[in-house]
């Protein structure tokens, strides 16, 4: 059976026990072998890996059961001097051998997209292997940027103000320059994610950052035609498996439904559905 997805909204704190314990359970329990992908972080891979490994061990994972995937932004190296740079690097798929779970950390989902997906949009060897393992039962978890990458259509960046005042972009073309400019009103970017979560667009940090408008716009403009959005609050996650979704943690998951919606003008919609789910809700 296809493995579970643990999709967390970032800043896991009081909900840590419930969220990470479920990830460990879905990955096989204390003896699970976990691969940690810190690709989104952009820097300090060893420090971030050690933090995640400690958090998982605190929630019951056996000591030494985590390993680091050395796949980072081009100028980053870990303490061993490693960086495989791309999911097509020779021998990279061997890092997935024997694992029962993988955790994607937060940061910038751009780096994950660039490392795991080829420029033409096809899967790298690493992503193709990861897909096959997930179909066989591998659990995939992630928080913040590690949640954003889960959906087929991904919010790559942007803000509510960007929806109102900037043209929506449908690729990461020119993104590095955009980051250097650091505009106060970044545009909404809608692009392809890794595609593990099949039900709609995922957004995160939802209770702490103003993101409702950008999620509505992303659903409404979704090139795949899916019109549902799943907005995860901080310190909250949902577990998805076999068509069923259950909320974990301290906050809420909001389901945005634009299937019957219409746009009045830019930033104004009619008939948008909004449903709130809390811990234990399915």
Where are these regions (language model features)?
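Short acidic, glycine/serine/threonine-rich loops at helix termini
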Residues: 114-116, 152-155
């Amino acid at each position: 059976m296809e493995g579970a997805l643990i999709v967390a909204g970032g800043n896991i704190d009081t909900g840590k026990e419930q969220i990470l314990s479920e990830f460990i359970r879905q990955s096989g329990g204390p003896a699970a072998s976990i691969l940690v992908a810190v690709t989104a972080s952009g820097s300090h891979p060893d420090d971030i890996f050690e933090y995640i490994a400690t958090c998982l061990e605190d929630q019951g994972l056996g000591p030494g059961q985590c390993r680091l995937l050395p796949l980072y932004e081009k100028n980053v190296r870990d303490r061993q001097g490693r960086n495989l740079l791309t999911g097509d690097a020779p021998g990279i798929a061997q890092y997935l051998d024997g694992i029962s779970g993988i955790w994607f950390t937060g940061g910038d989902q751009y780096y994950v997209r660039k490392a795991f997906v080829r420029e033409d949009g096809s899967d790298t060897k690493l992503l193709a292997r990861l897909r096959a393992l997930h179909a066989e039962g591998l659990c995939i978890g992630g928080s913040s940027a590690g949640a954003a990458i889960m959906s087929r259509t991904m919010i790559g960046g942007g803000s509510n103000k960007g929806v109102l005042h900037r043209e929506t972009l449908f690729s990461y073309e020119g993104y590095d320059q955009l980051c250097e400019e650091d505009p106060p009103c970044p545009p909404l970017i809608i692009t392809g994610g890794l595609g593990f979560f099949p039900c709609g667009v995922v957004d995160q940090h939802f209770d702490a950052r103003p993101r409702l408008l950008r999620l509505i716009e992303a659903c409404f403009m979704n090139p795949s035609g899916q019109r549902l959005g799943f907005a995860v609050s901080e310190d909250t996650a949902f577990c998805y498996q076999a068509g069923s979704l259950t909320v974990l943690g301290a906050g809420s998951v909001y389901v945005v439904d634009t299937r019957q919606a219409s746009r009045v003008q830019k930033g104004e919609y009619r008939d948008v559905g909004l449903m709130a789910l809390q811990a234990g809700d399915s």
